[in-house]
């Protein structure tokens, strides 16, 4: 993997007001993106810009427009739009790139920037390295006559709604479904409710009143507890929770149980087989549940594991010429529908499976035996130093010895937050918790040493 200074697994992120998330730095980043596009033969072409509902989005949206215009790129503004919607417009506008202002599932005080290449695919590491090289150069402006113009895309939300609706067969009996949506006060708030209502479902909408500061605040795909309760209270069939920018989805069955990304992948695999579109390969990650791998194998499907991060899932999908992949966190990519993870599209695949196969969400995963996973995170600034410390390395060896032949251990730095994630998987939940808690305690001790 190519070493990058600023880009993580999903673009650039940070706390607003601290580098890199200052207006000056973000403008420089946008100029760098535009400059790389010019170097690669896209001078003066269209670049799409969209954002989620964070208050700081106004600030960074304008900084990006200024930077792109300074590099001579033509800018088309989408306003608030789910990240996969921006990928869709990048593809259908045949734009040189799409730029997203979002920190996805992070707290509102964070923000970030991610970039789609032509075709709506996330940038490869090599392109991000080219952009970072420009960030080390002083910003310059093209000649005044070559500066980029700025336009607003008309009816963008309505166009994306129609795209989502057309991703599944028409005339399915959605009127049979009672849904509860959790829009995380994020970018799906003005899109997802209309998608499901226009298809005919009875829709109860929660967390769809963004004020700029409440995105992901105790809601959405990373906090589904309230959705679980609401589904049971409303006697709904299904709950659907998106994250702040709409590229993740987690679902809830009628009994209030979580249906995570691994279970969603299994349902999509079943649905495609039912329709005669058998999948030979599905791409997961190092975090993908062993139970899913075993269940897919029984269906004649091979699970390939990518590094954690939907960008790496996409790379493997393209390399293997496969169609479906994702992460247990809810990033689900259906490359024959959209070019990136799309929460609405993934949810529609599951609902179409229920309606066409005349079954329930509960029954679709009845034969999926997931193994127990214990996942915990700890905030660490000097992540590499802590992970490579002798104490943590010894603790890892001890943990692996305890789990020998009884499970597996994964410890990794987050690609989107200053955290270290520790995951243990196996059949003995008590053992898994003990192993993870001991490792977390050692990491916290070493964090103090390296602070």
Curated annotation (Swiss-Prot):
The active site is at residue 104. Pfam families: PGM_PMM_I, PGM_PMM_II, PGM_PMM_III, PGM_PMM_IV. One of its GO terms (molecular function) is phosphomannomutase activity. One of its GO terms (biological process) is peptidoglycan biosynthetic process. Keywords: Isomerase, Magnesium, Metal-binding, Phosphoprotein. InterPro entries: A-D-PHexomutase_a/b/a-I, A-D-PHexomutase_a/b/a-I/II/III, A-D-PHexomutase_a/b/a-II, A-D-PHexomutase_a/b/a-III, A-D-PHexomutase_C, A-D-PHexomutase_C_sf, Alpha-D-phosphohexomutase_SF, GlmM_bact. Its EC number is 5.4.2.10. It catalyses: alpha-D-glucosamine 1-phosphate = D-glucosamine 6-phosphate. Binds 1 Mg(2+) ion per subunit. NCBIfam families: glmM, PRK10887.1. This is Phosphoglucosamine mutase. It comes from Dichelobacter nodosus (strain VCS1703A).
